[in-house]
Design a protein with these regions (language model features):
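N-terminal secretory targeting modules
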Residues: 1-40, 44-53, 60-69, 100-105, ...
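Catalytic His-Asp segment of secreted/periplasmic serine-dependent ester chemistry enzymes
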Residues: 11, 50, 152-228
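Conserved SGNH/GDSL esterase-like catalytic core that processes O-acyl groups on lipids
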Residues: 33-38, 44-132, 166-169
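Active-site beta-alpha turn of Rossmann-fold NAD(P)-dependent dehydrogenases/reductases
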Residues: 41, 76, 151, 190
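Conserved beta-strand segments of alpha/beta enzyme cores
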Residues: 71-73, 146, 183-185
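Active-site segments of SGNH/GDSL-like serine hydrolases
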Residues: 110-114, 138-169
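Extended, non-globular alpha-helical segments
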Residues: 132-138
């Protein structure tokens, strides 16, 4: 009897170790400890310009909103592009490797702002292909994450080459197309995040503290509506 009980315990433990694909909040009866959320993005995700990005960036605020049972990882890198042919491709960075090795249950992708720069957007014919490659790579993870694609927020900075007309009229529609094509989840920040300069730093690109909170609220509400 003792031998049988031991075998049953070992079997249950082995099942728990294999259950990496859960994307619901875990309770005390679950095999999961936490729901892992990876936030992939550029400087807006990293928290550029904020006094305390570790607590004020939108991933940090999202962690506070989700609370216990969730682990949010900020994988943002300033100035990076979705385009692999851009000047600073995100997929060349350590944070991309970290996001994959994190084996997230939920992935939030917020890229595209830096792709709007003329020297990057000249490769626009590669945008859908490169984004699809990122989606396919994430879908192949053993954790089988839910993937949220975000359209970029309104941003404009002539000196940096960031063009809101390209973001709104070209990049955002392509992100929506990819959502439909892959049957993934959309967070349409280009529409949901107010086009209000009071929510941005003086550079016209990066959210201030209030903007970061608003961004986190929108993303939290979408996760809550679709996952919890």
């Amino acid at each position: 009897m003792k031998k049988l009980s031991l075998l049953l315990i070992m079997f249950v433990l082995s099942l728990c170790s294999m259950a990496q694909g859960c994307n619901k909040k875990c309770d005390s009866d679950s095999c999961c400890d936490v729901v892992r959320v990876a936030c992939i993005g550029n400087s807006i995700t990293e928290g550029f310009g904020l006094a305390f990005p570790s607590s004020q960036s939108w991933p940090a605020v999202l962690q506070q909103m989700l609370g216990e049972g969730f682990e949010v990882k900020n994988c943002g890198v300033s100035a990076r592009t979705l385009l692999n042919s851009g000047d600073l491709p995100y997929t060349k960075e350590k944070q991309w490797r970290d996001a994959k090795s994190f084996l997230p249950n939920i992935v939030i992708i917020k890229l595209g702002t830096n792709d709007s720069k003329p020297w990057n957007w000249k490769h626009k014919e590669d945008f859908v292909r490169d984004y699809q490659l990122m989606i396919d790579t994430l879908k192949a993870l053993s954790s089988h994450p839910s993937i949220y694609l975000c359209t970029p927020i309104h941003s404009e900075n002539v000196e940096w080459g960031i063009r809101d007309s390209v973001i709104t009229n070209e990049i955002a529609p392509l992100v929506r197309l990819l959502v439909r094509r892959n049957k993934q989840k959309l967070i349409d920040l280009n529409i949901l995040f107010p086009n209000d300069k009071n929510l941005l730093l003086d550079d016209g690109v990066h959210p201030n503290v209030d903007g970061s909170k608003r961004l986190a609220e929108i993303i939290y509400n979408e996760i809550k509506r679709k996952e919890l």
